[in-house]
Amino acid sequence: MRPFRPRAAIVLLGVPALLLMLAGCSTNRAGIYPYQWSIFWDSLLRPSPKILNGIWLTVSIAITSQIIGVILGIFGALGRLAKLWPARILANVYVWIFRGTPLLVQITLLYYGLLVARIYGWPDLVVLGITLPGQIQAGIFALGVNEGAYMTEIVRAGILSVDTGQLEAARSLGMTYPLAMRRIVLPQAARVIVPPLGNEFNNMLKTTSLLVVIAVPELYVTFEQLNGSGSTSFHPFELFLACAVWFLLLTTIWSIIQAFIERRVGRGYGGERPPGLFDRLFGARIRRADDPSQVSGGR
């Protein structure tokens, strides 16, 4: 049984207390800003179809972009570890560009830049009967290729954590290099890759809000539109507080899923027990500095 975590208990009790305190402030005592907490609670407890669509789009974009990032990360890591110098140069340049420039600039350039320069017009695409507008395609592509640069370093660190003798033994048994990587090296590297991969997806859920610059109607844009129209207009505090709570809920759900995945993949590095849910949410546990599972993409 895990010991009692006072800091976790304080946070768990403090968040509801803060919300109740805010709910009690039905009016501004100075009479400057007319709070309407019904907007806040309705956005959380009775979300409109528009909010639900924004949540669905946020999660869908995050999952799709993360999958693209993982695929690019695997190829990028293999490229950086390859013996062929063209592959190493290509992978290094890819990581250098997409880790060295702001994601917001990349999103703007890949959508508006390519569109205005008439390099690519981002026409609507129909996938499995679902129409994807151009800005959603551009957003997924931008988030995916940016994430791939960080996943390259994460996958590379995972591969390097596996003893080279494993690959040599597999090759001596007649396995080809791709087969040895797929059957021997990558499964062992998974327990080192999974923790930072989960953290990257947690960050991806929040990073989707940057797609506001190309008008993708994800969760943040949905609340921004609600703030400018109808009965909820000009109530930014209540609306964006509700938006923050929704993002917090999404990342908390993912943290729970991530904790179970890490326990399933392995019992931690070097026999150490993987962090629990409270440790993951509130940072109550001190990690070893030499633990490769804590390697991140260096954001």
What are these regions (language model features)?
Residues 2-299:
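Transmembrane alpha-helices and adjacent helix-loop boundaries
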